[in-house]
Amino acid sequence: MGNGVAAHRYFAHGQFETYTPIRWILGFLSTLGAIGPITFWVIQHKAHHLRADTTNDPHSPKYNSWFYVFYAWTFPQGNNEQEYLQDRYAKRLAVQMMRDPFYLFFHNHHYKIILTFSLILALIDPAYFLMYALAYCVDFFRLGAVNYWCHRSGYRNFETEDATTNNLLLGWLGMGFGWHNNHHAHPGRLILQHRWWEIDVEGYIGWLITKRP
């Protein structure tokens, strides 16, 4: 939910609009995913879509090791964040986001929120903290698996300029995150289901919390 629905579909792609209280909830969920501040996540993901499977892709398995694609790209110093910010589009996007008090709050307090939440869970019951840590590890692996395997093996519904594929296992177990070729073909589309078996749970969640007129 934090990475898939919040950071990815809502903040990075703006696939749906939602109510202000839910927007703040999504901000906290994205932060608790611990993959980096929302601003960093959005900028690197935009770079991924603009330069997918090129030497400038932040985490293409075509040019990077599996360890880098799964793990190391999440550290700003590991994927040359300054190079992103030298790009005019990325720099403009970063400036726009940092002018918004919402993004500025989560950017400035990213690690404080994670540490405070973890401490509260541990004080209530260490088992709660362990559950959070386990959920984080599972979601982290899911993201890495999509970044790696959905650019190497699977089937394609659309002929895109990159090597993206759909992966049945990651699509089903990843709540729709594995329909990667569908997503790269239509990055602004909320529901990624193109064939009947491509169940997109994250897309359905996004639809449920979409702001109604």
Where are these regions (language model features)?
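Flexible secondary-structure boundary motifs
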Residues: 149-155
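Non-catalytic, topology-defining segments of multipass membrane proteins
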Residues: 1-145, 149, 179, 189-213
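Active-site-proximal inter-transmembrane loops
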Residues: 92-101, 156-179, 184-186
